[in-house]
UniProtKB/Swiss-Prot annotation:
Disulfide links within the chain: none
CDD domains in the record: EF-G (cd01886), EFG_III (cd16262), EFG_mtEFG1_IV (cd01434), EFG_mtEFG_C (cd03713), EFG_mtEFG_II (cd04088)
Keyword match Protein biosynthesis: yes
Protein name: Elongation factor G
Keyword field: Cytoplasm, Elongation factor, GTP-binding, Nucleotide-binding, Protein biosynthesis
Family matches, as PANTHER family: RIBOSOME-RELEASING FACTOR 2, MITOCHONDRIAL (PTHR43261:SF1), TRANSLATION ELONGATION FACTOR G-RELATED (PTHR43261)
GO cellular component: cytoplasm
Gene: fusA
Name of one Pfam family that matches: GTP_EFTU_D2
Amino acid sequence: MAREYKIEDYRNFGIMAHIDAGKTTMTERILFYTGKNHKIGETHDGASTMDWMEQEQERGITITSAATTTFWQGQDGKKRRFNIIDTPGHVDFTIEVERSLRVLDGAIALLDANAGVEPQTETVWRQAEKYHVPRMVFVNKMDKIGADFYRCVEMVGSRLGAVALPVQLPIGAENEFEGVIDLIEMKALTWDGTIGAAATVGEIPEHLKDQAEEYREKLIELAVEIDEAAMEAYLEGTMPTNEQLRALIRKGTIEVKFHPILCGTAFKNRGVQPLLDAVVEFLPAPTDVPAIKGIDVKTETETTRESSDEAPLSMLAFKIMNDPFVGSLTFARIYSGKLTKGVSLENTVKGKRERIGRMLQMHSNSREDIEEAFAGDIVALAGLKETTTGDTLCDPLKPVILERMEFPDPVIEIAIEPKTKADQEKMGIALNRLAAEDPSFRVKSDEESGQTIIAGMGELHLDILVDRMKREFKVEANVGAPQVAYRESITRQAEIDYTHKKQSGGSGQFARVKIIFEPHDGDDFIFESKIVGGSVPKEYIPGVQKGIESVMGAGPLAGFPMLGVKATLIDGAYHDVDSSVLAFEIASRAAFREGAQKAGAQLLEPIMKVEVVTPEDYVGDVIGDLNSRRGQISGTEARGIATVVNANVPLANMFGYVNNLRSMSQGRAQYTMQFDHYEPVPTAVAQEIQKKFA
């Protein structure tokens, strides 16, 4: 089977926005107009196609990015292939946005015409900057009360620090909104609002002609700056033709020099078709963006893979999903080469082979089996055993590791336990499945309490995972309050001489150990034996180490694991009959418990590296608040039009911070935090913790 669409006719793009900017409705309209959907699903009916998990339909927010393939016939009469990735707009799901931006070539940023640039728009925009993704802006909900296109254009400059390039102007606003002025063709496009209606092309209304002329002039001035020859011709009085103007806008958009701005209302079916034409005209094909970089596994040097079917096969797994019918599905973007069903591929990150069983083309929640896929395609693969998000799959003869995705460490953890014995086993399976799907979600077992601890990016993130466990895996669980992972250590040297003796008829137990315990700089446990002359026989020494290690998990102050301890065995004694590995294990355990007390045990707490990105107006409040949380400010710097505040803050004082920050900055500041190091807890705080846990 040969390639049906040339790679130049592909557009891989996503729609990104703040929660409630109308993203799902827009995707629905796109799917409708491109002929994939016969009935439009409205978000407020809970019947939308892209939001296919039950909770998304209930909450009316998009959580998982579903990938959809669809087709559009442009104004030139040529059919193009669109691969659309839907992304969530809630701050706890930024990981989903990151992973979808990673595999896109372009994006449409949706703005609510009334609210303009909202906090999550800023976050997502910054993430797109990081991956250098070309973007257009669509000002949606132009029919809403308070809709203001020109304010939105101004905010793209002032809030996002981006160059706005309006290619359309609205005709009317709020309930008077009728259509748009196309500034390239200088025509008015109006719609009667019925579903599927084509635009009526007419002359620009008299009262808007001057404004349209003024904005067209600005458009041309910005566009010709992209190309020296066009600039010279323009300065000499030659205007670019409409075709040349489109080519200049395309070039500037792909080079991320500016962002075309369009407008309309997806819900009322006005402005959707021109947006689809703009995707074709201004957003890049896979061949228009730089070739993906990677590391050649054989030579360990940097290499690139061109977007071509002839290049060796390379693809990136960007999402894993559990499908109720097919099981585990791995979504992957093919960057180069050709993929055939049944072939064996190398997972270069894991060093394992994977065989491609079923290969599917996804349409939101329906699917079709395919035999072959090509460079530029986004496919879903069934039956992969080892592959997780961010892994590279490639031709085993030409192995490469593509740029890896970076995932933040979880910042909040809660204890979770099954409600019944029957839920116990199901919970383990459910949590492992969810962790395989979502790299920002971790599961571990707390050895002291026997509880299962889950960790994630925020409270909503964990809420939804617990909820999914209930629905998809039918597991009922009790959830605890968020917790901090404290540690313990020692502050000075202590020498302990301990004898373990037990005699009760028959063979007894005997072991004597002399051990020096001292702190060291690392976090790990170091054991050393300085026994000479056989005072402790060689075969018993591993028992001494094992005994100490077995009690390192629970320190003397509040039962937290111990860090940074060195133990040196310097002397001991044994009995020919009564000594054993077990006896030395018991002796060293008791020696450690005594030694930890004498060596000045102390509590340690996790210190987080916190970065707050805030508009200038709130810097003082942000710094004051971080100081009140026992934070230490390490510096501030300007980033675009925002200020970045860096600080080290104890995790214990960061719970509920997101809500504080939102109210302090009217929702305009965001923060990220990750674990940095452990530090001794101040005495007053340590006493509180000991009371609570001892």
